[in-house]
């Protein structure tokens, strides 16, 4: 078993595979945004994982990505100062003869800041460069240029077992594009910002081609908290930008509260939060699939831009929430009320 905790959001990898849990159907599920939000002057949670299936005979590699989370991210407004992230783990392996091997995090571990996760922040989003995903967590990886870790003594509280249901991307709450509008520039409508110049509109499909200089606005039909998942096919180095909003600009009129052209996403309510996902393609010939893991967004609308032509498929709004079994249901003849209930759940 693997026991892990951290100051900041962490994801663990063994032999190149992200650590998760296998359900009865053989699917791998992942606890997200570990270790969760706590009053870190007092408490931080640890998580427990059965990693038997990920270990192999001979050499094994274990590592973790750690981002700011609720420790030193913008969301806590400096509550704990600017202290660095930290990760702590203990791997217990019971051998066939009954002996137990214990592998802790200690000063023999190595670290670097040159991986594909360039930035991860609850408020400000995630920046990921897939070109830098070069097998960092595999036994064959050359870590000769990594540097030594340092012991952290910044946390003075209790480390307790995670309480409550796991935070997961819940499949039954996925949202799919209702409409996709692709536009180039704006046109005048007599208002402050004008309106977007739509060149293509797609209905009820989650794949499209986006060219450099174009912008796509995707309407998922309902607000929720979570992130976008997608598959992208394009040349290596292509940079995608995803912004998120709960509503569109309706008229393009500043006096009516809009912050951009009619049809674009409204983001002024985010105030100083960047709430943006940046993804740089590796350039896989068959496409590459991705979703962030160090942040989440409240959104119904997604705005996408690209530095070069790209094909996007399987665009899905993932709802990330407490994974609890629904014990009852509620339905009315009013669809908006049903959507409100679903959103609250």
Model-derived regions: residue spans:
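Extracellular/oxidizing-compartment recognition motifs
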Residues: 1-345
